[in-house]
Amino acid sequence: MSAEIICVGTELLLGEILNSNAQFLAQQLASLGIPHYYQTVVGDNPTRIKKVVAIACDRARLLIFTGGLGPTPDDLTTETLADFFATPLEERPEILADLERKYAHRGGFSPSNRKQALLPVGAQILPNPLGTAPGMIWQPRTGLTILTFPGVPAEMKQMWHETAVPFLCSQGWGKEVIYSRVLRFWGIPESMLAEKVAAQIAREHPTVAPYASNGEARLRITVRAKDEAEAQQLIQPVEAEIRQIIGLDCYGADEDTLAGVVARLLQERQQTVAVAESCTGGGLGEMLTRLPGSSLYFKGGVIAYANEIKVTLLGVNPEELEREGAVSAAVAAQMALGVKTRLASDWGVSITGIAGPGGATLRKPVGLVYIGVALPNGEVISREFRFSGQRGRDWVRYLSTMNALDLLRRQLLVNP
């Protein structure tokens, strides 16, 4: 038995508001173990709404509607559903009384508000404690259940939790859970990741699906089980296989971030880090200090755009700076060592590069970045990165910051 989410509203089609209701409902259905394979957005047009309903009835047994329950002429969900299933509408006295009470505190009840008291004959009221528009629970024919909710997210969510979920569970929905775990990777393209774990992706249970987001690759492992504990038992061996195959390119799972992983590693070792930034404008320091308790591991940073600051504050050799240029492996290494020494930290990390749009040459294009890491043992490494400048300055700065975090993470793991 599968569900389908149908969101009604021309404003959604025009992109005027974000369709967060569909995201919430999809997550809720997964947590209840109710499969759903389709989501539809349709405008405030009765003909098109009916076409959507006709298609949905052929492929789902639970239809969940949001939007179109208000008092205005373009709020058409209830009457369109009643018309589609050839069921008359009736005014519910209890809804009308509730509307009159609520509107008394909102400037008075008007005749147009009466339409919100109409439901198809046989439908059950789905109360709305926060707003004026009630929803309904309706089974217009055997084997089909319809739930309707207002489009206001806060109202919909409370109605879902308080009334819809208990109803669905009482009807035998939600006997299983659909549980997912997302593994996160940095430093490996999605296509290469998919090739390396092709055997795991080919399995049907658990399913493994690759995707990319904000420069990182991810694998979503999904399983259906009787409860979360069983789901985790099924996922664990698959996750272990993937981690063994991929190695250090897998940096975490679910809500982990590169900055959070670095922070945890530093705190476990009781070590500190300082940063020197030339093209990221403090972005690396911001990421490291976004987390609570960052003063335990973050000493501070130097934003050194001018060459004289690189020399006077970070100890970069002026002759080498002149010869190699500010954007070079040698300068990145000296910046990392300089900030580590100057701020008396265990680790030093530096970024120097050309974020664009200006400052580039044929030899040093936009997107050329060097990242340096000074280790506690005195060793200093630097790495060259060439990012595409076509996505703009902010993208180069973002990738520079993320790769600096990743390079530090890898060094923390291989230099315990």
From Swiss-Prot:
Organism encoding this protein: Thermosynechococcus vestitus (strain NIES-2133 / IAM M-273 / BP-1)
Matches recorded under SMART domains: MoCF_biosynth
SUPFAM superfamilies according to UniProt: CinA-like (SSF142433), Molybdenum cofactor biosynthesis proteins (SSF53218)
Name this polypeptide is given: CinA-like protein
Domain of life assignment: Bacteria
Classification via CDD domains: cinA (cd00885)
InterPro entries assigned: CinA, CinA-like_C, CinA_C, CinA_KH, Competence-induced_CinA, MoaB/Mog-like_dom_sf, MoaB/Mog_dom
Pfam families recorded: CinA (PF02464), CinA_KH (PF18146), MoCF_biosynth (PF00994)
Family to which the UniProt record says this protein belongs: Belongs to the CinA family.
